[in-house]
């Protein structure tokens, strides 16, 4: 993948960049793996706003992704590499020998025509999925399960990867992209390799309208709201916030305030905390 730049024909195009989509092999998704995706605009079942800055955007269809990778012993051939509007990573369509088709996260280096496997007998090659106890120390992995059989939950975004650091009893030590070192059950599965489309983070949106195409609504500063809408609101002109520290719209301290629950049950699995930004 390469980053495509545009001539500054307008102010919106001046710094805009996009992917050249060189890795994409087809623009037509597999129809049997599509599901309707209704827009919620950040509202819950009562119609109340629960997630800010959501709404609008281009119509999408959801691609059903196989995060479990549980087709043990059945070879699968990579048929296509496709764009997925619902995630930053690309996806790969796999045609299995028993006739089933599934989408998986496209790893870096995965190519059309390549054969992939799942299970204990699989080789340590890009795209293959194994239990963590069967993966050698030092291997780069992605799409990691947190509970056996639940499906991959960690390391699924474009360009991300984790590394196996060691094995202790029924747990395996994993270093995540954030620098956090975590213990995960050895019977959980992961996929070999780094997630593809690694230059996604270099894309410059360029203009506000492009964010709206993606379903992102504007972020309004609290200081320009009314006092009933935000703790920073009100006052005459460009007034200071009038608080000891910045506050969230719900009156909680923000910008550096720790929000992780104290005595979280998963604390015992974290060996080293993530790197500070």
Swiss-Prot record:
UniProt-listed InterPro entries: NA-bd_OB-fold (IPR012340), Rib_uL2_dom2 (IPR014722), Ribosomal_uL2 (IPR002171), Ribosomal_uL2_bac/org-type (IPR005880), Ribosomal_uL2_C (IPR022669), Ribosomal_uL2_CS (IPR022671), Ribosomal_uL2_dom3 (IPR014726), Ribosomal_uL2_RNA-bd_dom (IPR022666)
Gene source species: Listeria monocytogenes serovar 1/2a (strain ATCC BAA-679 / EGD-e)
Database matches in Gene3D superfamilies: 2.30.30.30, Nucleic acid-binding proteins, Ribosomal protein L2, domain 3
Task of the protein: One of the primary rRNA binding proteins. Required for association of the 30S and 50S subunits to form the 70S ribosome, for tRNA binding and peptide bond formation. It has been suggested to have peptidyltransferase activity; this is somewhat controversial. Makes several contacts with the 16S rRNA in the 70S ribosome.
Protein name: Large ribosomal subunit protein uL2
GO CC annotations, alphabetized: large ribosomal subunit
PANTHER family in alphabetical order: LARGE RIBOSOMAL SUBUNIT PROTEIN UL2M, RIBOSOMAL PROTEIN L2
NCBIfam families according to UniProt: rplB_bact
Residue span of region Disordered: 24-55, 221-277
One GO term of the biological process aspect: cytoplasmic translation
């Amino acid at each position: 993948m390469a980053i495509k730049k545009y001539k500054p024909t307008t102010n919106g195009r001046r710094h805009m960049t996009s992917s050249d989509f060189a890795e994409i092999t087809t623009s037509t998704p597999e129809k049997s793996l599509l599901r309707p995706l209704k827009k919620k605009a950040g509202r819950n079942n009562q119609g109340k706003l629960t997630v800010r800055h959501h709404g609008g955007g281009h119509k999408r269809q959801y691609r059903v992704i196989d995060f479990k990778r549980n087709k043990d012993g059945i070879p699968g051939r990579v048929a296509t590499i496709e764009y997925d509007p619902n995630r930053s990573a690309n996806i790969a369509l796999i045609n299995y020998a028993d006739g089933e088709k599934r989408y998986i996260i496209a790893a870096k280096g995965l190519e059309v025509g390549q054969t992939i496997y799942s299970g204990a007998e699989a080789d340590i090659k890009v795209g293959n999925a194994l239990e963590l106890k069967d993966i050698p120390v030092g291997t780069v992995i992605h799409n990691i399960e947190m509970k056996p059989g639940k499906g991959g939950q960690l390391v699924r975004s474009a360009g991300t990867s984790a590394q196996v650091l060691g094995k202790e009893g029924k747990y395996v030590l994993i270093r995540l992209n954030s620098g956090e070192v975590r213990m995960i059950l050895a019977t959980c599965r992961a996929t070999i390799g780094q997630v593809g489309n690694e230059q996604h983070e270099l894309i410059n949106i360029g203009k506000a309208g492009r964010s709206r195409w993606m379903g992102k609504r504007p972020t309004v500063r609290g200081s320009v709201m009314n006092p009933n809408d935000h703790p920073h609101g009100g006052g005459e002109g460009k007034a200071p916030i009038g608080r000891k520290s910045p506050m969230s719209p719900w009156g909680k301290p923000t910008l550096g305030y720790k929000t992780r629950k104290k005595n979280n049950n998963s604390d015992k699995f974290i060996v080293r905390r993530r790197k500070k930004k």
